[in-house]
Regions:
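Acidic, surface-exposed loops and disordered segments
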Residues: 1-211
Length: 211
């Protein structure tokens, strides 16, 4: 089903490799979003509880997420410092120390809930057209976010949602060959929430030198 949006919306005019648009978008509001939050929350809580039990009993098995991509793979050393810097800033705003596992889990659970935003979004890309399908999806998302902001609507990519495919499989008919790459949220940012005042540092774009 094609998304019904204004013809002058920039998000439908975004560039695409040979106009293939080899990605799909699923949107959830109302009761469907509530079911998704419950499902995601349950999977998240089960994993956290399993880790707590494993600390007491090494034989406890940790549930393995059914993600389509290795979302928890360690960041390469070249970019890891930037990732650590943002993590320290994020948890610091919440007053959470590195050793505070429960506190970190509370923050991450808010991500899983998509911050209770009225719209939850999910993006799928054709596996046989990677990396171009992922590039197109990224162009679409950035354009969508900018277009939404121009209308007073805030947004946030929520990559942690791609840790589990099961919840979206239960709610949407996903075309064969499409892989779940990221989620996102649309709504209105709480101006009183300290996290919304966070300004993440942006490493400079690295230009390659000519030979």
């Amino acid at each position: 089903m094609a998304l019904n949006v204004e013809k002058n919306d920039f998000s439908v005019r975004m560039a695409s490799r040979r106009s293939t648009r080899a990605f799909r978008v699923a949107l959830a509001t109302g009761e469907r979003a509530a079911r998704l939050r419950e499902h995601y929350g349950r999977l998240f809580d089960e994993e956290i509880a399993a880790h707590a039990r494993k600390a007491e009993d090494p034989d406890v098995e940790i549930p393995v997420p059914d993600s389509d991509f290795p979302v928890r793979k360690r960041y390469p050393d070249e970019v890891r410092p930037a990732q650590i810097e943002v993590a320290k800033l994020l948890y610091g705003i919440h007053g959470i120390e590195r050793a505070d596992i429960e506190g970190r889990s509370r923050v991450n659970r808010r991500n899983v809930m998509a911050f209770d935003a009225p719209v939850m979004g999910f993006v799928f890309v054709r596996e046989d057209m990677l990396p171009w399908s992922a590039m197109d999806a990224g162009l679409m998302l950035q354009t969508l976010f900018l277009s939404a902001k121009s209308r007073g609507i805030d947004s946030c990519p929520v990559g942690i949602l791609a840790t589990w495919r099961e919840p979206v499989e239960a709610e949407f008919e996903i075309s064969e060959g499409y892989r779940f790459i990221t989620g996102f949220a649309l709504g209105y940012a709480d101006p009183e929430a300290p996290i919304n005042a966070m300004q993440a540092p942006r490493p400079p774009i690295q230009l390659l030198r000519g030979r």
